């Protein structure tokens, strides 16, 4: 334990060997991505499981370079914001890398968002261009922004007051554009604005730099480098609009020279077919997918999954029985857990798969370069091993702050650079991190964040609702689902279905209320603060 816990400073560090992070200040995540790829130009970089299309590392660099030159011709400049509103495909990372190559900034948005949700994000970050697909055009066109349509002209007619271009046309330029354009990009420049609810409240733009992505990529693949493993083939059905899909899978794996199999939307048999067809070695999943792999034994065993070496789950803790059943269904794979946040560019800790399946509930050791303190939530002093407190973090992968929100930034990052996660956890004597509870009020539904405050605000906008509280409810498939306690006005005849429909029209499907209970009052403290934790305990005691 001496190696990872300093009793004098009360700071935890990683057992893993240190990583040499690049010190050149003039470095973009895109130039770092292709730093080594010249030595394996014909190696497969991206495979689209939906279309069968593939890109070698040479073709990937060529497409990124040509699109970057096209963006310059479309007058996209350093610090301009480009919104990607699209599902996973091999074109998604090409767009991200091209935008970053110019020093422009990518923001991403969940394709299931309503136009209101999309518009709210656009108002906050002020994009100059949107990249989308024909299926989402009816929402995207209402932003009245110039647009790029993925991937190519389709049979559907796209009406718009704004200009738009097709991705396939923009990447069909002359070979003289096959090198990245010269640009003045520094590691400290902003690369992405990914939206997160943080520790509480409405969605906020997390400001992530090129350095954040570069250092994260080295942390994520440090065990592969340490053990000298050859090229991995990684499945990516987790959304690339989310930090895990974009940073931990797409960017980090490609930067290491690993292959990535992209899938637009998760469907169990489709994913298993892709694993079998492309000999996928690494699966990155969230608990609902792990539960499917564990419980759908007949389906899972129908496919040849012998290539799978590792299944990594994040987003929420897994039960031991689920992990053990998954290990029985995919016997060649190490079943491990990891922990990350948007604010940490996706990585905090991860189990070492070479040490076998522990099934302990641990999220593993800290990634190299990250420090942690466990803070007593009453006295706010750091704690030694085996004592629970709020997890605080520091490292080169930590966000710069929240966009246009100095108050939230100051409440999350202290003067010494510690990022307060809002999660409760502890380290054991071996330096393994356990996440046991959340201070923050977020609901994790199918791995997505649902902010109770957002749904409560919508509920209170209804003329017949006087008060409301939204809390998580355990669900075997989703992990948690949002449910609501609602106080109706005296003469209201609102039904549960009325309230559910009212919310459903305004939010993405994963935010829908699964249950509404009418109550006479919402449980609050004398100061008027919702006693959310007590309410959660009360509801769960009745299960």
From Swiss-Prot:
It is found in: Cytoplasm, Cytosol. It is an enzyme of class 6 (ligase). Its EC number is 6.2.1.-. Signal peptide: none annotated. GO terms for molecular function: ATP binding; CoA-ligase activity. ATP binds at residues 196-204, 337-342, 423, 435-438, 529. The keyword Cytoplasm applies. It comes from the Eukaryota. Residues 267-337 are annotated as: SBD1. This is Probable CoA ligase CCL10. It comes from Humulus lupulus. PANTHER family: 4-COUMARATE--COA LIGASE (PTHR24096:SF415), LONG-CHAIN-FATTY-ACID--COA LIGASE (PTHR24096). Belongs to the ATP-dependent AMP-binding enzyme family. Residues 338-402 are annotated as: SBD2. SUPFAM superfamilies: Acetyl-CoA synthetase-like. Keywords: ATP-binding, Cytoplasm, Ligase, Nucleotide-binding. The keyword Nucleotide-binding applies. Both substrate-binding domains (SBD1 and SBD2) are involved in the substrate recognition, and are sufficient to confer the substrate specificity. GO terms for cellular component: cytosol. The gene is CCL10. InterPro entries: AMP-bd_C, AMP-bd_C_sf, AMP-binding_CS, AMP-dep_synth/lig_dom, ANL_N_sf. CDD domains: 4CL.
């Amino acid at each position: 334990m001496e190696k990872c816990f300093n009793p004098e400073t009360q700071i935890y560090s990683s057992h893993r060997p240190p990583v040499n992070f690049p010190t050149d200040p003039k470095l973009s995540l895109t130039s770092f991505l292709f730093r080594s790829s010249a030595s394996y130009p014909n190696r497969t970089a991206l495979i689209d499981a939906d279309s069968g299309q593939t890109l070698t590392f040479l073709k990937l660099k060529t497409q990124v370079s040509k699109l970057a030159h096209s963006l310059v011709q479309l007058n996209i400049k350093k610090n301009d914001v480009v919104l990607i509103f699209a599902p996973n495909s091999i074109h998604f990372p090409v767009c991200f890398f091209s935008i970053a190559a110019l020093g422009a900034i990518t923001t991403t948005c969940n394709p299931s968002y309503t136009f209101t949700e999309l518009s709210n994000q656009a108002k906050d970050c002020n994009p100059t261009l949107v990249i989308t697909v024909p299926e989402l055009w009816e929402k995207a066109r209402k932003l009245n922004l110039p647009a790029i349509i993925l991937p190519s002209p389709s049979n559907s007619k796209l009406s718009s007051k704004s200009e738009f271009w097709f991705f396939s046309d923009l990447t069909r330029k002359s070979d003289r554009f096959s090198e990245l354009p010269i640009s003045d990009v520094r590691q400290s420049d902003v690369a992405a604005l990914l939206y997160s609810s943080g520790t509480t409240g409405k969605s906020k733009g997390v400001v992530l730099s090129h350095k954040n992505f570069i250092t994260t990529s080295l942390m994520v693949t440090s065990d592969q480098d340490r053990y000298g493993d050859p090229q991995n083939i990684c499945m990516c059905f987790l959304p690339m609009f989310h930090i895990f899909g974009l940073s931990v899978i797409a960017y980090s794996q490609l930067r290491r020279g690993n292959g990535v199999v992209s899938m637009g939307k998760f469907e169990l048999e489709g994913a298993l077919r892709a694993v079998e067809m492309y000999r996928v070695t690494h699966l990155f999943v969230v608990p609902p997918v792990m539960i499917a792999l564990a419980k759908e034994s007949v389906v899972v065993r129908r496919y040849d999954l012998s290539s799978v070496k590792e299944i990594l789950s994040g987003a929420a803790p897994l039960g031991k029985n689920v992990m053990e059943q998954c290990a029985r269904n995919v016997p060649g794979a190490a079943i491990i857990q990891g922990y990350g946040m948007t604010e940490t560019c996706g990585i905090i800790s991860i189990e070492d798969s070479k040490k076998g399946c522990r099934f302990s509930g641990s999220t593993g050791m800290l990634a190299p370069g990250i420090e942690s303190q466990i803070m007593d939530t009453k006295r706010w002093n750091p704690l030694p091993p085996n004592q629970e407190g709020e997890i605080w973090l520091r490292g080169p992968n930590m966000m710069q702050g929240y966009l246009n929100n100095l108050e939230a930034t100051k409440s999350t990052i202290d003067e010494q650079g510690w990022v307060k996660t809002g999660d409760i956890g502890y380290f054991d004597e071996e330096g393994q991190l356990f996440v046991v509870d959340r201070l923050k009020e977020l609901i994790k539904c199918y791995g997505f964040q649902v902010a109770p405050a957002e749904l409560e605000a919508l509920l209170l906008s209804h003329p017949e609702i006087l008060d409301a509280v939204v809390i998580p409810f355990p669900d075997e498939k989703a992990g948690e689902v949002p449910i609501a306690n609602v106080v109706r006005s005296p003469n209201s005849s609102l039904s549960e279905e009325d309230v559910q429909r009212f919310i459903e029209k305004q939010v993405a499907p994963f935010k829908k209320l699964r249950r509404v209970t009418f109550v006479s009052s919402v449980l609050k403290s004398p100061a008027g603060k919702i006693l959310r934790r007590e309410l959660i305990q009360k509801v769960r005691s009745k299960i």
